[in-house]
Amino acid sequence: TPRAQQCSWGWLLKQHLDGLAASAEGLMCPEFTVSDEDGNQVTMSSLKGDILVLDFWASWCGPCRQEMKSLREQYKEFKDKGVRFVSISLDASSDKWKKACEEENIPWLSTLADGGWDDSEVRKLFGIQSIPHIVLVGKDGKIVGKNVRRNLLRDKIIELLNK
């Protein structure tokens, strides 16, 4: 109802549904901007051309930190085969993000989304409600998997490489 849409819960639900609709499998990955460890802007359009593994995480997320081991293994396996890994942190503090990157020894591009968890436009754009959350993007820029992890991620990457 229009009344429900105007209340705070209705507004939040609409935002979430809009994010899910804009980043559904089969659609072009939405354009976004994040910052690398040197403060340089990284955009989706600058990443196109390779298979992309977009890893949404945060330093305070225990399961995200555990997922890094699997991602490191897959990075080693696929880094020279046209697969690019990009971590997108939803930390509010750039210091905590940078410290976590050092602790995790992340060898791929690590970026920070403005706004932290609460106010990140990138999180809202992808309709992310929990992390870790991995989005797989094909060479053509279309989303081919959302919330794919570990063996499922590996299988989907192999499938894309064999096309």
Task: Label the model's feature ranges.
Residues 66-104, 115-124:
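Structural microenvironment flanking redox-active thiols in thiol-disulfide oxidoreductases
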